[in-house]
């Protein structure tokens, strides 16, 4: 599923690439599109940044995954960009965790950026070169700042190094919303009911 989503996003990126490359760029990277995994009802992405300073509003109306695609330009000695996102929760359920993952050769730089819940309590953050996994001891019902999208004093953006990504190639950044256990239970129950209906119809 994720590879299919990435392929779709990157095919869109490829279409945008010719347009982006046609004009001179003073930046090493450009955002070219986003795709939500199904179900995508009520989900949206709005870009507020550009070039080497990327910032987004990401709205989750359903618990799913969004993948952002970026095209690189190797016109800098040390290609990197700052990244921040206000991740809004419109699902009606708490976020119990959020996972941010890089694909395509990009990696997170040290030091780590900020993770700021609005009402939830952050239990821990595990950072690897390609993933940031966040968990909550009390779920987040409203929004979380990944990096510093709101310009808060003392907060900092996440830095992403894409020096290993070839010029003109794309890399992806995905954000996955992890629902509370009760949501999983309801989802599994719903899938079980659907399976029962299908089996009865087949008979």
Describe the function of each predicted region:
Residues 3-30, 167-197:
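Short, threonine-centered small-residue motifs that mark membrane-proximal processing/anchoring sites
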Residues 29-177:
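Mature extracellular "passenger" or substrate-interacting domains of secreted, surface-exposed proteins
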Residues 200-203:
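Short, charged juxtamembrane terminal tails flanking transmembrane helices
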């Amino acid at each position: 599923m994720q590879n299919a989503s990435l392929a779709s996003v990157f095919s869109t990126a490829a279409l945008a690439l010719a347009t982006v490359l046609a004009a001179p760029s003073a930046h090493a990277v450009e955002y070219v599109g986003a795709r939500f995994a199904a179900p995508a009802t009520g989900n949206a992405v709005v870009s507020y940044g550009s070039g080497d300073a990327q910032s987004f509003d990401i709205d989750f109306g359903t618990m799913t995954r969004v993948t952002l695609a970026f095209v690189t330009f190797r016109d800098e000695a040390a290609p990197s960009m700052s990244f921040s996102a206000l991740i809004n929760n419109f699902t009606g359920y708490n976020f119990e965790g959020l996972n941010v993952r890089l694909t395509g050769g990009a990696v997170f730089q040290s030091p780590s950026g900020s993770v700021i819940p609005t009402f939830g309590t952050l239990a821990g953050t595990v950072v690897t070169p390609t993933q940031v996994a966040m968990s909550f001891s009390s779920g987040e019902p409203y929004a979380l700042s990944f990096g510093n999208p709101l310009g808060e004093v003392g907060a900092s953006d996440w830095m992403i190094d894409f020096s290993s990504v070839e010029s003109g190639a794309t890399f992806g950044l995905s954000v996955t919303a992890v629902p509370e256990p009760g949501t999983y239970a309801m989802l599994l129950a719903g899938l079980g009911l659907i399976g029962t209906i299908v089996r009865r119809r087949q008979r």
